[in-house]
């Protein structure tokens, strides 16, 4: 009963956050939108900001991870990890995220429960020019809405700068980067990522990324790489799949993720 109540409370919280974001957005979409651009693919975020009046849902409906540490194997499935994005003002978007529902198996122990949520914003800092990369800032907080096993039980801040060098590259190529800091229970980690993309066709893209986490105070560095594909089914709908492996022991050994994104109105 307690678990059902907790899930119900999380649903109410999520619905409330989404309603607030919708009310805060402009009533009419402005301008003809470009093809959908999401933060779904790989670990880092896109530097693109949603146009005013548009609402975008990005859902990782299935994620699976395997790891082995101290001869103890673990399997972790995450369902419906979602991000809700609102084009609030020109060069500014509001965001709410839910980190998903977990099913975890470690050794002979099983556990399940909801993850925390997120409130954040993305703002344009620099426009692309001949001398500088397009750069945005993504900053926010995690909200402790999850079950104890999957929550920090605190409000944790984070931020990342997202410089993109895509406009310096040939038309079919892209390069986005992420440099920032996240906190978890007062422990800070420096996080980085660099994503390289190639447009196979007008609707299909391939991406590869190196990423990592370096504790600022103490702990072990974690580094990995991943790769994946996006398929723009329509101008406002995208499917994606990506997978990754660790480059050192502290990182997750292997993971795979599949997602769906839609922007409204079209």
Language-model-derived ranges and their functions:
Residues 29-266:
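Transmembrane beta-barrel domains of Gram-negative outer membranes and organellar outer membranes
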Residues 1-38, 266:
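Cleavable N-terminal export/targeting peptides
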């Amino acid at each position: 009963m307690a678990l059902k109540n907790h899930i119900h409370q999380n649903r109410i919280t999520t619905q409330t956050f989404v309603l607030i974001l919708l009310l805060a957005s402009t009533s009419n979409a402005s301008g003809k939108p470009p093809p959908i651009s999401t933060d779904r693919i790989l670990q880092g975020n896109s530097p693109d900001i949603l146009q005013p009046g548009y609402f975008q849902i990005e859902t990782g409906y299935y994620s699976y991870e395997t790891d082995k540490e101290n001869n103890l194997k673990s399997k972790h499935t995450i369902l419906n990890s979602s991000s809700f994005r609102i084009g609030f003002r020109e060069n500014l978007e509001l965001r709410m995220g839910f980190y998903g529902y977990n099913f975890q198996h470690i050794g002979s122990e099983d556990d399940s429960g909801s993850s925390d949520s997120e409130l954040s914003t993305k703002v344009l800092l620099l426009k692309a020019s001949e001398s500088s990369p397009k750069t945005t800032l993504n900053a926010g907080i995690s909200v402790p809405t999850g079950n104890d096993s999957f929550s920090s039980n605190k409000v944790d801040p984070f931020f990342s700068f997202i410089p993109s060098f895509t406009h310096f590259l040939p038309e079919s190529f892209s390069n986005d980067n992420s440099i920032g800091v996240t906190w978890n229970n007062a422990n800070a980690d420096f996080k980085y990522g660099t994503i390289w993309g190639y447009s196979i066709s007008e609707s299909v893209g391939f991406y590869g990324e190196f990423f990592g986490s370096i504790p600022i105070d103490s702990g072990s560095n974690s580094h990995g790489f991943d790769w994946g594909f996006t398929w723009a089914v329509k101008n406002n709908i995208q499917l994606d799949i990506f997978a990754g492996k660790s480059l050192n022991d502290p990182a997750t050994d292997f993971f795979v993720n599949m997602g769906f994104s839609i922007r409204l109105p079209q």
